[in-house]
Amino acid sequence: MITQRRLQHLLALVEHAHFGRAAQALNISQPALTKSIQALEAELGATLLDRKRGAIALTVFGELVLQRGRSLLSAEADLRREVALLAGHEIGSLKVAIS
């Protein structure tokens, strides 16, 4: 199943360009990250990554999933924010600079 977690794993992998560093940033093991990406590929029936000599690159399918995944995760965050605002709960962060 395409899950939020698997999409977040793909985004982290692309951001860090390395399975080990992405796994560390996600606080999961490298084998767990590998299994998550493989499960996403199996679910979609497409190879998302080119894995050559320790380097990774997105395939055309990977680029599409990355783009749509970002949109889905952003839409989910927006929905949560809007529902919280309607329910009277404030969420988010405010940065203030004083000079």
Where are these regions (language model features)?
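Glycine-centered flexibility sites
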Residues: A17-G20, A32, G45, G62, ...
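A broad detector of short, well-ordered amphipathic alpha-helices
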Residues: G20-R21, V60, Q67, S74
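Interdomain hinge and pocket-entrance segments immediately C-terminal to HTH DNA-binding domains
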Residues: G54, A84-S99
